[in-house]
């Protein structure tokens, strides 16, 4: 009996305390009413009410009366805690400024009362909110998209409401909030450091967030596993993540899964499935998917060739790339072809060696102004083995500018005009440097001053002065000046609209490699403005722009992986870039497969896949790829032996790219009658053409011609009067099937013997000493008037 009385008293106290807390909440929430802000109160001002029960058509039911008792006791406990302690990570003013551990210490989890909706009351359907009746839970008025309902008919009058979520939904939401914290902490480390150890630590955070089904973390980790970026490469794990993302409708996941089916990595190759996933990815707005589809429609890969469809996809991507171009320009990406680098080890790939960079740094520290400006430009744009670093660029430009270098002043002006984390944006400071550089006749400064007058940056807009400075810069060949002149003529700003002049200056700027010049030319050719409309030309120009996007940095990442002998990571990265239409990636992927360096591809699939990418690279005009296609058909690598097809590829390489190797091969095929009728005269002609096309071909051509002379002599004897004597003579049977190789070897040995003998003769002949200088005759000084003037 006493227990029941105590329990009754306890319940009565709890009810009274709960009523008092509810009254206090009602008064507090009146200031944040929906009528005044047209949005629901934040999670901090209203407790999160969920239920362990079920939601049926928006109506929430409580499982038992015991749940109500527990909720009242929970409310009493909650009322003793201040609301200031309940800090939500997603609504903190600057979540990226705190690490995950700091945020976790500050944030306390929102306590969930198991009492249905607000105050334990069920939803009232319909309910009135902003003069509109709702028959089910809604997310209107909330920025976070959470469903809610009112517990009375008119929300404006009573302001009683609650969230329409079960305890399971609330747990998922809290898990997502924690996952977001972990993801932000990882991204802060990833974006704030260039050290590999810290980036690996960042990916540990991202992996943890991905394990909690955080979509962005899943996207990051899946591609990191695919490429082996700071994580051990695992194609199967990447595939599973792509499938999970695809089920959730992630465009990045769909594009990744499409790539796996296109390349046959981790799955059986299926171009049909690849096309489906690429299409879904493009519909979701993924730029990589758009670029892949643009290339496929342009080249007719898996689809009917359609220039207009390719134009649609490429133009969309090019619009994004052009909008990202800054005044200082983006990072420079070096396109290095592995076949060329291996064939010509001494070839300059454009990459700077570490010791050379250190030498320039030494010169810069000693006050060499040219070295300071050069290093400043390298660090400003990146590339050639130097990472982009605006702080170092600013420091080097400052040193050179203080020494009076106009180029450094102009680039400082560009950095101040653009603004960054290192250099604060300042039109006044930029104008100061531009004027100093322009007064010294520097075209970069003149172009910057023209931009200031064109857009009114620190000065009044003055189109005449803008035109004047752009013309001065363009006359000195500066691409920015040429581009801006073209834009002024195209839009008729400060001058009469003139599409011919615009086309002229855009062409000049494009010859200097300016991305926006290519973009503007593409727009003109696509719309037929100032020129005859040409879909093909527009697509090629837009493709050029698209290949300058931020994803092109993956080319250098793949190259570095190859240099580190991580061939699997390199080939996967090159394969994705090859899907996007990069010719250099297609040839590099084919080269790695051709060398059988990547174990990620099966033995039986190596040559067929290499053949596929050699073919795509050859169709984009790469000579080595065209010759490789001939070699593959000649020897039967990845396909059947087909001399006629090999002959066609060699002939194309000879006619279109004037390849000495292709000419030599054509000579050999004419000599042997492989894929073509045997013709000794045509064989000699192609051998001679090869020797003229390349000095490197002269020695093998000489040997081939010597052998050809012997063959011609034997053929002549056969057709002479003593034909009957040699009718039965079969050189292959007499000397063996490789008799021509033996003959070439003998000729080479004889030639070497003659050369050695001649050199020895020259050494034996005593070299006469030159006679000593004769004493100069004494000079007689003439009279002073005959001396020449000094």
UniProtKB/Swiss-Prot annotation:
Biased composition, class Acidic residues, residue ranges: 67-78
Subcellular location: Endoplasmic reticulum membrane
Additional information: Gene disruption after residue 465 and replacement of the C-terminus with a beta-galactosidase-neomycin reporter gene construct leads to complete embryonic lethality; most die before 13.5 dpc. Only 5% of the embryos are viable at 15.5 dpc. Mutant embryos display defects in the differentiation of the pancreas epithelium. The defects in pancreas differentiation can be alleviated by pharmacological inhibition of Notch signaling (in vitro).
Phylogenetic placement of the source organism: Eukaryota, Metazoa, Chordata, Craniata, Vertebrata
Entry comment describing in which tissues the protein is expressed: Highly expressed in pancreas, white adipose tissue, liver and spleen (at protein level). Detected in heart, brain, spleen, lung, liver, kidney and testis.
UniProt key word Nuclease: no
UniProt-recorded name of the protein: Protein sel-1 homolog 1
Gene null: resulting phenotype: Taxomifen-inducible gene disruption in adult mice leads to premature death within 3 weeks after the onset of taxomifen treatment. Mice progressively loose weight and become moribund despite increased food intake and normal blood glucose levels, suggesting nutrient maladsorption. After eight days of treatment, the pancreas was diffusely dark red and soft, suggesting severe pancreas atrophy. Still, the endocrine parts of the pancreas were not affected.
Residue intervals passing through the bilayer: 735-755
Native source organism of the sequence: Mus musculus (Mouse)
Gene: Sel1l
């Amino acid at each position: 009996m006493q227990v029941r009385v105590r329990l009754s008293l306890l319940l009565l106290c709890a009810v009274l305390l709960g009523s008092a807390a509810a009254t206090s909440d009602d008064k507090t929430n009146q200031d944040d009413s929906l009528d005044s802000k047209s949005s629901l109160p934040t999670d901090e001002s209203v407790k999160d009410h969920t239920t362990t029960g079920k939601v049926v058509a928006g109506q929430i039911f409580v499982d038992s009366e015991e749940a109500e008792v527990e909720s009242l006791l929970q409310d009493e406990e909650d009322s003793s805690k201040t609301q200031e302690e309940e800090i939500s990570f997603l609504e903190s003013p600057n979540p990226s400024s705190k690490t995950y551990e700091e945020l976790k210490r500050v944030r306390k989890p929102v306590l969930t009362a198991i009492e249905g909706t607000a105050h334990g009351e069920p939803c009232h359907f319909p309910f009135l909110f902003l003069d509109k009746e709702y028959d089910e839970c809604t997310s209107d008025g909330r920025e976070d998209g959470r469903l809610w309902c009112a517990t009375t008919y008119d929300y404006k009058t009573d302001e009683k409401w609650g969230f329409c979520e079960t305890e399971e939904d609330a747990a998922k939401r809290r898990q997502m909030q924690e996952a977001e914290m972990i993801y932000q902490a990882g991204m802060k480390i990833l974006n704030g450091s260039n050290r590999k150890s810290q980036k690996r630590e960042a990916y540990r955070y991202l992996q943890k967030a991905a394990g909690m089904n955080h979509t962005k973390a899943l996207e990051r980790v899946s591609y990191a596993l695919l490429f082996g970026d700071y994580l051990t490469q695992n194609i199967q794990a990447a595939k599973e993540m792509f499938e999970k993302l695809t089920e959730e409708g992630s465009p990045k996941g769909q594009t990744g899964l499409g790539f796996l089916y296109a390349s046959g990595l981790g799955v059986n190759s299926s171009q049909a499935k690849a096309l489906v996933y690429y299409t879904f990815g493009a519909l979701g707005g993924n730029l990589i998917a758009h670029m892949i589809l643009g290339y496929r429609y342009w080249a007719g890969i898996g689809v009917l060739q359609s220039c207009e469809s390719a134009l649609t996809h490429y133009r969309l991507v090019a619009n994004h790339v052009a909008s990202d171009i800054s005044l200082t320009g983006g990072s420079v990406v070096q396109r290095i072809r592995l076949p060329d680098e291996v064939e010509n080890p001494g070839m300059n790939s454009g990459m700077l060696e570490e010791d050379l960079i250190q030498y320039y740094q030494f010169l810069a520290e000693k006050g060499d102004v040219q070295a300071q400006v050069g290093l400043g430009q390298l660090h400003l744009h990146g590339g050639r083995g130097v990472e982009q670093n605006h702080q170092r660029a600013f420091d080097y430009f400052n040193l050179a500018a203080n020494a009076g270098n106009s180029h450094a002043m102009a680039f400082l002006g560009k950095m101040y005009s653009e603004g960054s984390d290192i250099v604060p944006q300042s039109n006044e400071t930029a104008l100061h440097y531009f004027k100093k550089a322009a007064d010294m006749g520097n075209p970069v400064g003149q172009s910057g001053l023209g931009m200031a007058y064109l857009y009114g940056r620190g000065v009044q807009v003055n189109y005449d002065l803008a035109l004047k400075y752009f013309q001065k810069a363009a006359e000195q060949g500066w691409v920015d000046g040429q581009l801006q002149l073209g834009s002024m003529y195209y839009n008729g700003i400060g001058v009469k609209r003139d599409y011919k002049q615009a086309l002229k200056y855009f062409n000049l700027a494009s010859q200097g490699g300016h991305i926006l010049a290519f973009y503007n030319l593409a727009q003109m050719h696509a719309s037929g403005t100032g020129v005859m409309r040409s879909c093909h030309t527009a697509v090629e120009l837009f493709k050029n722009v698209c290949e300058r996007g931020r994803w092109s940095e993956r080319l250098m990442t793949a190259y570095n992986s190859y240099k580190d002998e991580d061939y699997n990571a390199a080939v996967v990265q090159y394969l994705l870039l090859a899907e996007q239409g990069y010719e250099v990636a297609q040839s590099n992927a084919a080269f790695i497969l051709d060398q059988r360096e990547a174990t990620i591809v099966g033995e039986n699939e190596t040559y067929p896949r290499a053949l596929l990418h050699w073919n795509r690279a050859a169709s984009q005009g790469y000579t080595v790829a065209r010759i490789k296609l001939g070699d593959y058909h000649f020897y039967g690598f990845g396909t059947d032996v087909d001399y006629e097809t090999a002959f066609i590829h060699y002939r194309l390489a000879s006619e279109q790219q004037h390849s000495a190797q292709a000419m030599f091969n054509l000579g050999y095929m004419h000599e042997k009658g492989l894929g073509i009728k045997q013709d000794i005269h045509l064989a000699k002609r192609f051998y001679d053409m090869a020797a003229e096309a390349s000095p490197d071909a002269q020695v093998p051509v000489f040997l081939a011609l010597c052998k050809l002379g012997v063959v011609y002599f034997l053929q002549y004897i056969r057709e002479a009067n003593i034909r009957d004597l040699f009718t039965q003579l079969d050189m292959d049977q007499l000397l063996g099937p490789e008799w021509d190789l033996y003959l070439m070897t003998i000729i080479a040995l004889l030639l070497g013997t003659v050369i050695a003998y001649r050199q020895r003769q020259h050494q034996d002949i005593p070299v006469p000493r030159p006679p000593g200088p004769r004493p100069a005759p004494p000079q007689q000084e003439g009279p002073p008037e005959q001396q020449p003037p000094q």
